[in-house]
Amino acid sequence: MATRQGPLVALATALALAATVVPASAATFVYVGCTDSNEIHVLQLNPQNGNLTPVEKVTIPGIAKTAGSTPMAISPDKKFLFAATRGEPMVAASFRIDAASGKLGHVANGPLDGSMAYIATDRSGRFLLAASYPNHKVTVNPIAPDGTVQPAKQVVPTEPNAHAIQPDASNRFVLATSLGGNLIKQFRFDAATGTLSPNDPPAAQVKAGAGPRHFVFHPSNGRVYLLNELDASVYVLAYDAKTGTLKEEQTLSALPEKKPDKIWAADLHLTPDGKFLYATERGTSTIAGFKVDPANGTLTLIEHTATEQQPRGFAIDPTGRYLLAVGQLSDSLTSYAIDPATGKLIKLKQYPMGKNPNWVEIVNLP
């Protein structure tokens, strides 16, 4: 009985705390990119219990052939959602987000300069940053006031397989991973013109064969956390906010004890308070949870949780109480409560999605 009671008590505690941190006026909406069915599923998240209610399914118009994944990003003012398509044609689809209902209204399809594995806006919301895995480059596209993505104003060749790109909190620097180059590109960013230029040094190296993929900035401790796809290692990197450069501090594994035939790490996210970090691995279909040391930012493994089949993408809600993971091969989403004391995941419910769900965005509106 003791082994069963623990998770139930933790769940009750997590839900009770969640109920106290969400403003009554806020509504939380979830957006799931489902590539093979060319859909974005919109759901509403109940902050009291983590339940998800379907709102609508939106088709990305003008797509003749789907491929790969559906990277998405939400503008800083929460007015627009951008979705990149990787088939035919390759576009950045802009949608206006209705603040009351969370529903999406298509604005336009803007041109992309290649197949983009990752997109993000700069901190002003005036530029779309994108990383192209097969085309080995990063790009900057202006975003018009109505949300339309304009043609690229800058295309920067990179080492092989650019995989992710993000600005730092100051919007003065941008980092981008090169999986095949085993490095993180370090750029200066002119936010007035939307121009990238090499930083000094222009890159931070990682171990050969690691395969840098996704990364996150910690909200307060001056660290960047990097997930490497090919060996499932997680790097803790000190981030110098004055210079926009990185220095390795710790390396540990996101793999469970039983190793897969093919290591294929995918995504990672921090809770908004920076207390816990999670990473998915597609070969084992697991989520690794880590506790972040409040003093020095180092990581300690919490546990591995079995999840959806081939979990390419997941997200954590703005309260930090719920984690939503999707499976490319299971065509479904599983919701979890995050124990606020331990960081352990408590499974709540599974929901059907479209075909090949692989990207999740969550936002509080208004």
Per-segment meaning from a language model:
Residues 175-232:
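Loop-centered beta-sheet repeat module
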Residues 37-39, 87-90, 134-137, 181-183, ...:
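Short glycine/acidic-enriched loop and turn motifs that connect beta-strands
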Residues 61-77, 112-127, 155-173, 205-223, ...:
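Beta-rich, blade/repeat-based domains predominating
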Residues 53-64, 105-110, 151-156, 199-205, ...:
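A short beta-strand motif characteristic of beta-propeller blades
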Residues 10-20:
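Bacterial N-terminal signal peptides
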Residues 26-47:
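An edge-strand/N-cap motif at the start of beta-rich repeat modules
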Residues 43-50, 95-102, 141-148, 187-196, ...:
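Short loop/turn segments immediately following beta-strands, especially the blade-tip
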Residues 32-36, 83-87, 130-133, 168, ...:
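Conserved beta-strand positions in repeat-built beta-propeller and related beta-rich domains
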